[in-house]
Amino acid sequence: VTAGSLEQFEAARPRLFSLAYRMLGEAAEAEDVVQEAYLRWEKAGPVATPAAWLTRVATNLCLTRLTSARARRERYTGPWLPEPVVTGPGPWETVEQRDSLRFGVLVLLERLTPAERAAFVLREGFDYSHREIASLLGVSEANARQLYRRAREHVGEPRKRFEAPAQKEVVERFLTAMHQADLPALERLLAEDVVAWSDGGGKVSAARRPITGRAKVLRFLLGLARHPRLASAEFTVAPVNGEPALLVFESGALSAVMVPEFTGGRLSEIRNVLNPDKLAFAAAQLSNGQAGTRHDGSRPLKPSNFSSALASSGTSTTGPKRPGSRG
C-alpha cells in the first residue's frame, strides 16, 4: 500500500464507519466492515473513483452481514436494540443528514429488508441520488426509487425534532426524578402511551417484553430507582447517537445507557441498553475521554469523576488508528 493510497483510505474511513454503523446498528460489526474494506482496498489495483469504490464495497459487505444478522436477531433473548455510540463534533457531523443516526431511527430500520435499508441510509444519511444508489446496489434507477419509497413508508416521515437545549433539560429533569424516586415528577414527564424497552441479551436481568403505558412504566422506573444496586450507582447525561441520553455507572463501569425519545415534550419511548457486549464500544469511547464537559463548562470529564457532574456535550475521539479500523 502506497502512502497516497493509505491516505485516501484514511480520508474515507469516518464515512465508511458511519455508513456501516447505520446499516448494521452495531459499532463492532461496523469496525469489522471497515477493516474488511481496507483489506480489499489493499489488494485492489488503481481505482478511478476511490470514494465510490469503497462505498460500494462497504455497502455490499453490510448487505451480506445483514442477511445473517436477521436470523440471529430473531433468536435474540428479549428486545434487540442497536449499540449506542457517544457522539459529538467530528465524523458524525460530516454527514449532511444526521437524522438517520438517531437511536429511534436505527430501531425502525430493523423493519426493512437489507436492500431497503441500504437505499434509505444512502439517501437519508449521505444524500446520494437515486441514480447513484442504483449504481451502488447494482439495480435499475426505478428499482432504487422503489426501495427507498418502501423504506420511507415503513420508517415514516421524520418527526419534528425537539430543540437540543429543551431536550437536554427534560433529560436532566428525568435524571433528577429517577435519582430522587420522585413519583409526581416522573409522572409529569411521561406520555400516556409511553413504552419502555430493555435489551439485556440474556446476559443481565432485563424485562424481555416491552412495558407499555404510563402507569406500568412508572412502576418500572420507580422499581429501578429504588433498587439496591442503583443506590450507589453514578448517573450522567451524554450525547448518544446525536441526542442526550442517560448513562449509568456501577463501580466505575458503564452498566446501562437509557435513550429517551420525546413526543410533544414528553417521554414517549425509553430504550435501555444493558447487554454488556453492546456497551463495550461506548465504554471504550468514554475511557478515551469522549464524555464531554461539566455542566459548568470546566474541564472534560474523565471516567474517575463522572459522578461529579452532568456531561452536556461530547467530542469525537478516534484514538490510535490502524489501517481499516476506527480506533
Q: What would you call each of these model-derived segments?
A:
Residues 132-135, 141-223:
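Solvent-exposed, charged amphipathic helical/linker segments at domain boundaries
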Residues 55, 59-77:
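Arg/Lys-rich amphipathic alpha helix in sigma70-family domain 2
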Residues 72-94:
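Internal acidic/polar
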Residues 11, 86-117, 167-168, 176, ...:
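Amphipathic alpha-helical segment used for protein-protein interaction
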Residues 1-18, 28-31, 48:
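A short, charge-rich alpha-helical start-of-domain segment used by transcription regulators
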Residues 16, 30-41, 54-57, 104, ...:
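Short, small-hydrophobic-rich alpha-helical interface motif
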Residues 26-27, 35-51, 68-71, 157-159:
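Sigma70-family region 2
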Residues 112-128:
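Short amphipathic alpha helix immediately N-terminal
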